[in-house]
C-alpha cells in the first residue's frame, strides 16, 4: 500500500517490504509507541505484535482474510495494480475512507508475491486528556544539539508558535493531513495551551509576539459533529466539501475565547494566526443565530487583531471544475472574503494584505483554466507570488489521479498535465504581470483561440512571436514564490 514513486513514475511495493524494518508506526505515533514499549517490557516479541493499531506488519498469504470479512478490507494486489492503474485508484478510495473513520476504521490487507502486508486501523482521535498528556511533556523547544550555533530558518519561523489542535476535516485533495491525523479534531484544553504560552513567553528572545496559535487549519479548534452517531457512520473525506455538513458544529466562539485568554496573559502583546484559515468554514451560514454571530465576529477579530500584516488563505484556483477536484470552495467565496477583509481594514485604519495561494497543473486543470485564472486575479488587483506547480506527494487523492489517470471515487479518467512543457505552459500564467512573460503568453492565448483573454490581460496589445527571446525556458518564479506544503 504505497503510492507511486514520483521520480521513477513507478508503483513501488510497500515501504515495509523495501526495508529491513519489522514494523512501521504511522500517523501521530504516541499511542502505538507506548503500547509497543509496554508489550516489549512484558516480554512479548515484536513478531507477535500483529494487532497494534497504527502499525503496518508483514503477514503470510494464508492469513489474508476473506473478501467479505467484516473487520478487514482486502485491497487489489500489488501485481494487479501494476497491470491495471484503475485497480490502484480503487484501492486509494478505501485507504482514504478508513483513515477518516471516527472509530479508526478496519484493517487493510494487500497481497504481494510471497507475503501480505496488513495496515492496522488508526486510533480514534485523541481525547483532550490524551492530547494534553502528550503536549504537556517537558520538551526543550530547542533544535537538536548538532545544530548548535546554526540558524535553522524553519525553526525561526515556528519557535514562538503554539499548536492548539490536531486533525483537519477540510479534506483537500492534495493534502496528507487525513493520512497522518485523520479528519476528526483533537483539541487541547485551554489550561494546557495557556501553560505552553507561558513557557514560550519565558523563552530567551521572546518579545511578546506569538507567531501562531494554530494547527493543520487555523480555525477548527473545538469543532466536532453535533450528533456523533452520525459521524460514526460517515465516510466523507471532507466535512466542508461539496458543502458544509449540517451535522458540523462550526461555532468559532470557543476559539475566540481562547484567543482572548492568551492575549490576556502577562508578557503577551499580540497573538498572530500564521496557519491557513478556512474562510469557507467561518463564512458558512449554519441557521443558528448564535453560531453565525460568533463566526462573523471571528472573521472581524481575526483580521483586525491577529494578522501580522499578511493573512494567508488558499483559494488554490478560480475554475469550478478544478476546485471541485481539489475539494475546495468556489472562487466566488474568496471574493466575498476579500471584501470582508478590505472592509475591516478600511474601518480599522489598517493596511494589511491578503495573500492567496494558487496551484497550477493540478489534476483536472487545463491551460485555458490557467489563462482564466490570470484574468480573474488581475481583475481583483492581485499579482500572485505564493504559487506552486503541482508536485505529487504520497497518500493524497491528487497524486493518485496524477499517477493512475482516474478519479478514485468515480474511476472516470481525469486529465493531468504531466510533461515539463505542459506544466510550464500552465505555470507561466501566474506571472502575466512580468514583462518577460507577456509575448509568450500572447502567443499561447492565440494558440488557444482566446483573443478575449489576451485583450483582458494585455489591453495595450503585445506583439507575438518573441517568446523565445523574451523568456528563458528555465525561468524561475519571484523569490519566496510559494511556501512548502
Segments (PLM) and residue ranges:
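Conserved SAM/AdoMet-binding glycine-rich loop
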Residues: 199-355, 359-363
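N-terminal pre-triad scaffold of radical SAM enzymes
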Residues: 150-176, 209
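Glycine-rich beta-alpha loop elements in corrinoid/cobalamin-binding modules
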Residues: 1-112, 119-120, 124
Amino acid at each position: 500500500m504505497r503510492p507511486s514513486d514520483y521520480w521513477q513514475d513507478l508503483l513501488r511495493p510497500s515501504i515495509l517490504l523495501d526495508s529491513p524494518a519489522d514494523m512501521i508506526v504511522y500517523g501521530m505515533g504516541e499511542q502505538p509507541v507506548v503500547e509497543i514499549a509496554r508489550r516489549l517490557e512484558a516480554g512479548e516479541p515484536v513478531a507477535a505484535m500483529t494487532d497494534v493499531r497504527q502499525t503496518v506488519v508483514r503477514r503470510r498469504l494464508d492469513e489474508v482474510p476473506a473478501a467479505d470479512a467484516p473487520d478487514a478490507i482486502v485491497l487489489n494486489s500489488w501485481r494487479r495494480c501494476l497491470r491495471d492503474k484503475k485497480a490502484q485508484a480503487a484501492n486509494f478510495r478505501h485507504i482514504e475512507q478508513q483513515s477518516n473513520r471516527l472509530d479508526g476504521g478496519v484493517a487493510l490487507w494487500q497481497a504481494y508475491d510471497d507475503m501480505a502486508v496488513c495496515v492496522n486501523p488508526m486510533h480514534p482521535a485523541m481525547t483532550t486528556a490524551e492530547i494534553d498528556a502528550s503536549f504537556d511533556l517537558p520538551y526543550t523547544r530547542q533544535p537538536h544539539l548538532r545544530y548548535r550555533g546554526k540558524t535553522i530558518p524553519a525553526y525561526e519561523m515556528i519557535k514562538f508558535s503554539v499548536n492548539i489542535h490536531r486533525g483537519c476535516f477540510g479534506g483537500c485533495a492534495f493534502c496528507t493531513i487525513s493520512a497522518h491525523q485523520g479528519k476528526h479534531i483533537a483539541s487541547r484544553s485551554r489550561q494546557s495551551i495557556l501553560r505552553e504560552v507561558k513557557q514560550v513567553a519565558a523563552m530567551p528572545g521572546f518579545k511578546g509576539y506569538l507567531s501562531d496559535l494554530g494547527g493543520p487549519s487555523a480555525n477548527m479548534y473545538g469543532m466536532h459533529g453535533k450528533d456523533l452517531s452520525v459521524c460514526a457512520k460517515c465516510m466523507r473525506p471532507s466535512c466542508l466539501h461539496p458543502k458544509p455538513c449540517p451535522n458540523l458544529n462550526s461555532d468559532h466562539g470557543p476559539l475566540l475565547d481562547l484567543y482572548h485568554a492568551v492575549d490576556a496573559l502577562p508578557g503577551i502583546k499580540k497573538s498572530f494566526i500564521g496557519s491557513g484559515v478556512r474562510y469557507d468554514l467561518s463564512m458558512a451560514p449554519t441557521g443558528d443565530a448564535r453560531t453565525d454571530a460568533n463566526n462573523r465576529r471571528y472573521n472581524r477579530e481575526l483580521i483586525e487583531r491577529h494578522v501580522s500584516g499578511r493573512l494567508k488563505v488558499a483559494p488554490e484556483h478560480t475554475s469550478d471544475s478544478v476546485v471541485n477536484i481539489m475539494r475546495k470552495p468556489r472562487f466566488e467565496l474568496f471574493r466575498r472574503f476579500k471584501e470582508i477583509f478590505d472592509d475591516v481594514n478600511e474601518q480599522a485604519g489598517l493596511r494589511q494584505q491578503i495573500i492567496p495561494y494558487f496551484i497550477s497543473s493540478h489534476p483536472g486543470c487545463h491551460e485555458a483554466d490557467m489563462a482564466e485564472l490570470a484574468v480573474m486575479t488581475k481583475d481583483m488587483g492581485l499579482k500572485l507570488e505564493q504559487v506552486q506547480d503541482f508536485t505529487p506527494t504520497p497518500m493524497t487523492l491528487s497524486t493518485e489521479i496524477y499517477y493512475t489517470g482516474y478519479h478514485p471515487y468515480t474511476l472516470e479518467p481525469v486529465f493531468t498535465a504531466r510533461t515539463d512543457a505542459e506544466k510550464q505552459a500552465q505555470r507561466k500564467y501566474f506571472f502575466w504581470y512580468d514583462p518577460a512573460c507577456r509575448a509568450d503568453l500572447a502567443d499561447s492565448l492565440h494558440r488557444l483561440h482566446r483573443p478575449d483573454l489576451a485583450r483582458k490581460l494585455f489591453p495595450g496589445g503585445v506583439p507575438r512571436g518573441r517568446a523565445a527571446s523574451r523568456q528563458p525556458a528555465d525561468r524561475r518564479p519571484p523569490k519566496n514564490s510559494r511556501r512548502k506544503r
